């Protein structure tokens, strides 16, 4: 390829990266700006972080969202992993049909899903409740776990499982000592996706949560309607930092994005090559 074409590709790559990360960096910078409404001149301050942890209602909402998302992700991990494991004993024809069915909650707009679940919950007498919100979010995040873990099952070598059975290991021992470690990257990826999707899912939480319950997405939506909120920038910066720390932690453990969301070998195996 010519040098001009290479430069064009690099420029396009730079524009894409700028489009992705400049807004995030801008929010972090604005979280330290003491000028009203985040305008110029830029005056460095940490008072928005002080406001966040003293008088703001955002930390309580964030903590509620985190606890709720962890509970939903944990349930999705257990149900999704066992479902993907059970699919290995289905015929390929029915397994493909089930996988196609599991994609529907991802494809169908969350607004439609929320209204449908709310109508059903109202019909059975549950209404807007923690249980309704929990089941609604579980329905949406469960396909991510099933599909990611099932993809890892499809790529794994089943010879160690057969060898363990020949040596007299029980089915439970084979699953815990052989199967689960082999699909662990897929399980981790499914858990991360379930946590992120549930934590950010404003639509489901807005329509299904009890009236007095305000998760972080609902709280942010309510407050942003009244105008610029500087402590929102501070909370956003902390969430970005937490995401970066998670990526660094996974990298230190030997897992990359390719290991978790694709590829035929896990990070631990790559490090030993």
Predicted regions and their residues:
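Transmembrane-helix boundary motif in ABC transporter permease subunits
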Residues: 1-6, 70-102, 119, 175, ...
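Short hydrophobic faces within alpha-helices
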Residues: 62, 87, 104, 159-167, ...
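N-terminal, non-cleaved signal-anchor transmembrane helix
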Residues: 1-56, 60-63, 67, 254-273
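C-terminal transmembrane helix and the adjacent membrane-cytosol boundary/short C-terminal tail
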Residues: 2-11, 94, 150-161, 165, ...
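Interhelical loop and adjacent transmembrane-helix boundary motif
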Residues: 2-3, 35, 49-58, 199-249, ...
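Transmembrane alpha-helices
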Residues: 12, 17-24, 104, 114, ...
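Hydrophobic positions within alpha-helical transmembrane segments of bacterial inner-membrane proteins
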Residues: 22-24, 69-85, 111, 115, ...
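Membrane-interfacial helix termini and adjacent extracytoplasmic/periplasmic loops
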Residues: 37, 46, 94, 111-140, ...
């Amino acid at each position: 390829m010519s040098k001009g074409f290479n430069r064009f590709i690099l420029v396009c790559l730079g524009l894409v990266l700028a489009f992705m990360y400049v807004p995030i960096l801008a929010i972090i910078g604005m979280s330290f700006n003491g000028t009203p409404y985040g305008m110029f001149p830029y005056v460095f301050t940490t008072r928005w972080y002080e406001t966040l942890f003293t008088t703001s209602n955002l930390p309580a909402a964030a903590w509620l969202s985190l606890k709720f998302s962890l509970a939903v992700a944990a349930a999705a991990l257990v149900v999704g992993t066992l479902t993907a494991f059970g699919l290995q004993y289905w015929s390929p024809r029915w397994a493909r049909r089930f996988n196609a069915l599991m994609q529907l909650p991802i494809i169908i707009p969350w607004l439609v899903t929320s209204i449908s679940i709310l109508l059903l919950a109202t019909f059975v007498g549950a209404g807007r409740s923690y249980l309704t919100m929990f089941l609604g979010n579980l329905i949406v995040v469960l396909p991510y776990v099933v599909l990611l873990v099932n993809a890892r099952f499809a790529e794994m070598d089943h010879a160690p499982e057969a060898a363990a059975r020949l040596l007299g290991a029980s089915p439970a021992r084979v699953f815990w000592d052989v199967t689960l470690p082999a699909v662990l990257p897929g399980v981790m990826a499914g858990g991360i996706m379930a946590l992120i999707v549930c934590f950010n899912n404003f639509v489901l939480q807005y329509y299904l949560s009890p009236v007095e319950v305000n998760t972080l997405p609902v709280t942010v939506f309510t407050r942003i309607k009244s105008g610029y909120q500087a402590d929102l920038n501070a909370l956003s910066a902390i969430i970005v930092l937490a995401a970066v720390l998670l990526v660094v932690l996974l990298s230190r453990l030997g897992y990359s994005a390719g290991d978790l969301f694709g590829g035929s070998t896990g990070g631990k195996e790559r490090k030993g090559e």
